[in-house]
A protein has these predicted regions:
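Beta-loop-alpha module in the N-terminal Rossmann-like domain of NAD(P)-dependent dehydrogenases
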Residues: 79-111
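Glycine-rich nucleotide/cofactor/substrate-binding loop typically near the N-terminus or early
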Residues: 32-88
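Conserved anion/nucleotide-ligand pocket segment
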Residues: 152-215
Length: 241
């Protein structure tokens, strides 16, 4: 049976990668709902291609443009945070893929967990801001939370099936755009330089957070909540490759 997916943040880099996987595996997955913050044009194109049941645009000012773009379809169009909460709790959804950016991802995760949905989580701020609440809530509702961002997904896969306790977790780190800069050089770097990641093409926020290493701090916190490992047993390894 196909897994019915609500994809939050479908127009961002992780959302687009998720749709690539769905496109390549039509027998395994189907899209029921797509959401975006304000990129209504891409959202409309995606909704038509994947024959989504509904779409949500978080920025209510874009609602009219999105509704008009989908006027000739049967796709239901919603806007705002409350609509986001309602679609993730729909009985037509099996898996919620949370690819939202920032704190905006927290409340949809909570709503999905309360409905007992499986959450494929790429939004690290959910656990950075609310891990102490979200993880016990997920356990209470028997709602699996599966990390899909690179480092935590790798750790999750390594630990699956293992019965011995975890002694230590190592989170890898590319080092970002400034990994070879001295402290003195860092005083004069620009936004444009920070956005030139040496390895990956990502959204602006995650690229900046990578350059400042704030992202890696978030990932240590995320690993703590996901795997129940104390922070003192989580280390970071610079691995430019």
């Amino acid at each position: 049976m196909k897994q019915r997916i609500a994809l939050l943040g479908s127009t961002g880099s992780i959302g687009i990668q998720t749709l690539d996987i769905v496109r390549e595996n039509p027998g395994l997955f189907e899209i029921t709902t797509l959401t975006a913050h304000r990129n209504w044009e891409r959202l409309a194109r995606q909704a038509v291609e994947f024959d989504a049941d509904s779409v949500v645009i978080a920025d209510e000012r874009r609602y009219d443009a999105l509704r008009q773009a989908l006027d000739d379809t049967s796709i239901k169009v919603y806007a705002g945070e409350e609509a986001l909460r309602q679609v993730v709790q729909s009985g037509q959804v099996d898996v919620v893929v949370n690819a939202l950016v920032g704190y905006a991802g927290l409340m949809p995760t909570i709503a999905a967990v309360e409905a007992g949905k499986k959450v494929a989580l790429a939004n690290k701020e959910t656990l950075v801001a609310g891990g102490c609440y979200v993880m016990p809530l997920a356990a209470r509702h028997k709602a699996p939370i599966v990390p899909i961002d690179s480092e935590h997904s790798a750790i999750f896969q390594c630990l699956t099936g293992e019965k011995s306790p975890v002694r230590r977790l190592i989170v890898t780190c590319s080092g970002g755009a400034f990994r070879d800069r001295s402290r003195e050089e860092l005083a004069h770097v620009t936004v444009e330089q920070a956005l030139k990641h040496p390895q990956w093409r990502m959204g602006d926020k995650i690229t900046i957070d990578s350059a400042t290493l704030v992202n890696k701090g978030f990932e240590v916190i995320e690993a703590h909540w996901l795997f129940g490992t104390p922070a003192e047993r989580i280390s970071v390894l610079l691995h430019p490759q």
